[in-house]
Design a protein with these regions (language model features):
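Active-site and adjacent substrate-binding regions of carbohydrate-active enzymes
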Residues: 112, 534-578, 591, 660-670, ...
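Glycan-recognition surfaces
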Residues: 419-426, 516-533, 577-684
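Extended Gly/Ser/Thr-rich low-complexity repeat segments
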Residues: 38, 97-107, 120-135, 453-473, ...
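Carbohydrate-recognition beta-sandwich/jelly-roll modules
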Residues: 26-360, 394-402, 549, 679-682, ...
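Autoprocessing Asn-cyclization modules and mimics
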Residues: 408-501
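Aromatic-lined carbohydrate-binding/catalytic grooves of carbohydrate-active enzymes
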Residues: 312-431, 514-539, 543-570
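Carbohydrate-binding surfaces of carbohydrate-active enzymes
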Residues: 391-404, 410, 427-428, 669-756
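C-terminal motif of bacterial Sec signal peptides marking the signal peptidase cleavage site
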Residues: 16-17
Length: 756
C-alpha cells in the first residue's frame, strides 16, 4: 500500500538526517513514531486522520532498556545515533546497542543486532512503551486499545522470536501474573470507588486450589490478568513491554513474583537450568498502530504472515479469523452412536470426547494410546466398540476431528519418564549431594546444603505428597530438612512411586524435583529437552492414533520449567513442527489457560463452563461467579475468541429459543463453546432437530461473515431476542427481532463477498 504523508513538513522531517532537536520520525501506513536524540519515543500518531499524540508528554518510552539481574538495575539510553536503518544506543554502564529499525507497510520491525560490551547485562527490554490510551488493556499480546467510535485506534507489539516474551526483565521468574488489577475501561459508566485506584492489585478468590473459586469479582472495573505484556499506571494509561534474556547460564529464581501472595500458592526458589545457545542477541519485535477495527485482520495477520510466525488454520482459515470461530461438540455419557450425525446436522467439525479419561503423556506407548495394535476399544456404540484410531478414521470420512483431554506435560507415575524408572531429564529445582553412603533401607539421608529444601515443591498448591528428591533412579519422598549440621532430610519414604530403593554412594547428586499438582494431575515436570520430546509425542499421538484436537488441562504446568512463555512457545513449536513433518493438519487445541506463549498456536479457550460462564436462562455472563465476565474481557482485549466454556446440553427441557439466544450472543461477542452433548439426553429432546437447524443456520452465516458490526452490537443486548432464517431460493439470511414470540423488525444479511 502506498503510504500517506500527513504534510510536506512531515515528509521533510522523514527525509532529513534529523530534526532540529535531533529527533527522527518513522511511519507505516497507519502509524508514525518520533524518536528523540536520546533514543526515546516521544511521539505516537494515527496516520489515518488528525489525532492527538498517544505518547504521554510526561512519560517518553525508551526504545530499548538493559537489565542487570545481579544488582537489579535498569539502564536506559543516554544517546542515540541513527544511520543506515540502525540506531546506535549508548548507555550509562558503557554498553552500546545496535538496533535495526525497518519500516514495513503496516508495522516497524525492531531487532537487537549487537550489544558490546555487555558489562553485566543479563536481559534486554523493549520499552516500556507508554501510551495515554486508557480504554482496553490487552495484557497478553501487548496492546493498548481505544475502541470508542471517536478514537478507534490501537497500539501494540508482537514478539518475533521465541526468546522474546511478554513482560519486564525485572521479573526473572517469568511465571506470569495472577489475580486482579483495578482498571475501568469506561470511567463515566463504571467509575472507580474512592477506595480503589488504577493498577491496584488483588489476589484471586478462594483457597488457591479450587480454580472455580478464583473468579470472585463481578464489578467491571476488576480486571483479571492472564499476561503482563501490558499494564496500567496509576492514571489507567496502558504501557506495553517485551523482554529477552541470556538463558545460556542458569539462574536462581523466586517464582512467582510481581503478584500479591496467594494462599497455597506461595513462591518457591528454583535453580533454572542452562539453555545452550539461547541469548537475547537477535531479539525482535513488531511495533504497530492502526485503527482498532482493522487491527486483527489487516495488521496483526500481516505481521504473522510476513514474519513467519505460527499461522495455524482450521477449515482453511486462520484460527484467529472471527468468521472461523465455531463450537466444538464435547461429549458426556459414553455412548457414541449418533454423535457424528449430530455434528453433521449442525455443521460442526470437532468431537471432543470429554467422557474419556484424561490422557497422560507417556512416550512409552509411541503415540499408540490404545496399544500397538489398537487393542483398547474405548468408544462405545450400541452394537460395537471402537479404538481411538478406528473412531477417528470413521469420523474423518465425514471431515470430522476427534479430540481428547490430556494433562499437558505432567508425567504421571507409571509412565515411561516418571516411574518405576525415572528419567534423568526431569525438571530439577535444586541439586545437592550426599555426604554419607546409603544402603537400601536407610532413611537418614545426609546432604551438603539444606538451602530451600524446606519448601514444599511447586508453588502451585504445594502438594505435600509430591515433595520428593531423586538419587540415581530412585524417587524418595520427604518432608522437612534439619537446620543444623549434619543436614539431613526428614520423614523419608524410600522407593517412592514404585521405584527401586538401592545403594547410593557419598557424593551422588540429590535432585529435588519439580512436580505438577495432586489428584488427577499428579506427576513430575520435564526439563526443557524432555519437554521437547513430549511435544513431539503429542504429534505422534495424532499420527498413530488419529486425534486432531487436544484439551490441555494443566496447561499452566508448561510454566513450571521456570521459563514462562519461552517454555510454552518452545513446546508448541516442537509439536506443530512434528505434526507438519508427518503431513498432518494443524492441531486444534484448547486448554486450562491462555498466554502470550500459546496465543499464536491456540485455536480456542473453552475453559470452565455452566453457570460460572454463562447463564442462558438469566442471560448473564456468570450467575454464580465472575468467570464469564473475566474471561470474556481477557479474550476480547487480546483479539482471541471468547467462550461459554463447556455448556448448554440439549435435554428434554431445551428450547429453540434458548439456542437462538446462545448463537446470537456467541456471534455478537465472538464466542466459541464446548457444546455438551450426551446422546441419551439429546434423544429425550422433542425439539432436537429444530435446535440442530438453529445452530447450523447461525454458524453458516457466521462463516460467511454476514454480520456487520452494528448488528453484532445489537446481538450483545441480552434484553433482545432473535431468530435467523435462511432466505429461500437465494443466498443470505433474514434476522428477525422477536417480541413476545412474534417476528418484529427484520434485517437482511448477506455473505460479505456477496454483490448485494
Amino acid at each position: 500500500m502506498k503510504r500517506k504523508y500527513i504534510s510536506l513538513a512531515a515528509m521533510a522531517l522523514l527525509l532529513s538526517a534529523c530534526g532540529t532537536d535531533g529527533s527522527r520520525s518513522f511511519q507505516t501506513d497507519y502509524f508514525r513514531i518520533d524518536i528523540d536524540a536520546k533514543g526515546y519515543i516521544v511521539g505516537m500518531w494515527n496516520q489515518t486522520k488528525e489525532s492527538r499524540n498517544f505518547s504521554p508528554a510526561d512519560q517518553p518510552s525508551p526504545l530499548l532498556a538493559l537489565y542487570d539481574e545481579d544488582i537489579k538495575r535498569y539502564y536506559y539510553p543516554q544517546k542515540a545515533h541513527y544511520g543506515g536503518g540502525r540506531y546506535r544506543l549508548e548507555y550509562e554502564n558503557g554498553s552500546v546497542a545496535t538496533v535495526s529499525l525497518d519500516e514495513k507497510d503496516k508495522y516497524f520491525k525492531l531487532k537487537l543486532e549487537n550489544l558490546e560490551p555487555r558489562n553485566g547485562i543479563d536481559g534486554i527490554q523493549w520499552g516500556n512503551y507508554y501510551t495515554n490510551i486508557t480504554n482496553i488493556l490487552g495484557e497478553m499480546i501487548g496492546v493498548a486499545r481505544d475502541t470508542t467510535e471517536a478514537v478507534n485506534y490501537a497500539i501494540g507489539a508482537l514478539a518475533l522470536d521465541d526468546n522474546t516474551i511478554g513482560g519486564e526483565s525485572r521479573y526473572t521468574s517469568e511465571t506470569g501474573p495472577s489475580g486482579y488489577i483495578v482498571h475501568t475501561p469506561d470511567p463515566v459508566n463504571h467509575p472507580l470507588p474512592l477506595t480503589l485506584h488504577e493498577g491496584q492489585q488483588f489476589t484471586m478468590g478462594g483457597d488457591g486450589i479450587n480454580d472455580v473459586a478464583f473468579y470472585n469479582r463481578k464489578e467491571p472495573y476488576f480486571r483479571i490478568l492472564y499476561g503482563n505484556t501490558a499494564f496500567v499506571d496509576c492514571n489507567g494509561r496502558i504501557n506495553i513491554r517485551y523482554h529477552s534474556r541470556d538463558r545460556r547460564k542458569g539462574k536462581m529464581i523466586y517464582s512467582p513474583e510481581g503478584n500479591p501472595i496467594f494462599q497455597n500458592n506461595e513462591p518457591n526458589h528454583m535453580m533454572r537450568q542452562d539453555v545452550p545457545g539461547v541469548d537475547f542477541i537477535g531479539s525482535s519485535i513488531a511495533l504497530w498502530g492502526s485503527p482498532d477495527s482493522i487491527a486483527l485482520m489487516d495488521v496483526i495477520q500481516n505481521i504473522v504472515k510476513e514474519e513467519g510466525l505460527p499461522y495455524p488454520t482450521f477449515n482453511g482459515k486462520w484460527v484467529k479469523d472471527p468468521t472461523n470461530y465455531m463450537p466444538d461438540i464435547c461429549t458426556y455419557g459414553g455412548l457414541m452412536d449418533s454423535v457424528a450425525s449430530y455434528a453433521k446436522q449442525m455443521g460442526l467439525k470437532v468431537i471432543h470426547t470429554y467422557d474419556q479419561p484424561f490422557l497422560q503423556a507417556d512416550r512409552g506407548n509411541g503415540g499408540f494410546i490404545d496399544g500397538p495394535n489398537h487393542e483398547k476399544k474405548r468408544y462405545h456404540f450400541t452394537d460395537k466398540d471402537l479404538s481411538t484410531r478406528e473412531y477417528a478414521d470413521l469420523l474423518a470420512k465425514d471431515g470430522l476431528i476427534l479430540g481428547r483431554t490430556s494433562i499437558s506435560n505432567s508425567m504421571a507415575p507409571g509412565t515411561k519418564d516418571c516411574s518405576p524408572v525415572p528419567s534423568d531429564s526431569i525438571c530439577i529445582l535444586h541439586r545437592r549431594f550426599l555426604t554419607a553412603d546409603l544402603n537400601e533401607t536407610d532413611t537418614m539421608i545426609y546432604i551438603d546444603d539444606p538451602t530451600h529444601l524446606e519448601e514444599i515443591a511447586c508453588w502451585e498448591g504445594h502438594t505435600k505428597e509430591l515433595n520428593m528428591v531423586k538419587i540415581g533412579k530412585e524417587l524418595i519422598h520427604y518432608l522437612g530438612v534439619t537446620k543444623e549440621k549434619p543436614y539431613r532430610l526428614m520423614n523419608v519414604t524410600r522407593g517412592y512411586w514404585g521405584t527401586q530403593a538401592t545403594v547410593h554412594e557419598k557424593g551422588e547428586a540429590v535432585d529435588k524435583l519439580q512436580p505438577a499438582v495432586g489428584g488427577a494431575y499428579t506427576g513430575l515436570i520435564p526439563n526443557l529437552e524432555l519437554q521437547d520430546e513430549l511435544a513431539r509425542h503429542y504429534a505422534d499421538i495424532c499420527k498413530n492414533s488419529g486425534l486432531g484436537m487436544f484439551d490441555y488441562d494443566g496447561q499452566e504446568f508448561f510454566f513450571h520449567t521456570g521459563f514462562g512463555a519461552y517454555s510454552v512457545k518452545r513446546f508448541f513449536r516442537n509439536m506443530f513442527a512434528q505434526a507438519k513433518q508427518y503431513g498432518l493438519p494443524d492441531i486444534r487445541f484448547t486448554g486450562a489457560t491462555l498466554s502470550e506463549g500459546s496465543w499464536h498456536y491456540q485455536s480456542i479457550w473453552n475453559v470452565g463452563g455452566g453457570l460460572n460462564i454463562y447463564d442462558v436462562k438469566k442471560r448473564v455472563w456468570g450467575s454464580t461467579t465472575s468467570q464469564g465476565k473475566d474471561l470474556r474481557d481477557v479474550t476480547y482485549a487480546n483479539f482471541f475468541p471468547s467462550s461459554f466454556g463447556g455448556n448448554f446440553p440439549i435435554t428434554a427441557e431445551s428450547t429453540v429459543e434458548d439456542y437462538e439466544h446462545i448463537e446470537a450472543t456467541a456471534i455478537g461477542y465472538g464466542c466459541t463453546y464446548a457444546f455438551k452433548i450426551g446422546q441419551k439426553d439429546v434423544e429425550s429432546c422433542p425439539q432436537k432437530y429444530a435446535i440442530f437447524r438453529v445452530i447450523r443456520t447461525w454458524e453458516e452465516a457466521r462463516r460467511a461473515d454476514a454480520f456487520p458490526t452494528n448488528i453484532k452490537k445489537m446481538l450483545q443486548d441480552p434484553s433482545l431476542s432473535w431468530r435467523l432464517e435462511k432466505k429461500e431460493g437465494k443466498e443470505g439470511w433474514t434476522l428477525y427481532q422477536m417480541v413476545n414470540g412474534q417476528k418484529g423488525k427484520s434485517f437482511d444479511l448477506y455473505p460479505k463477498q456477496s454483490t448485494h
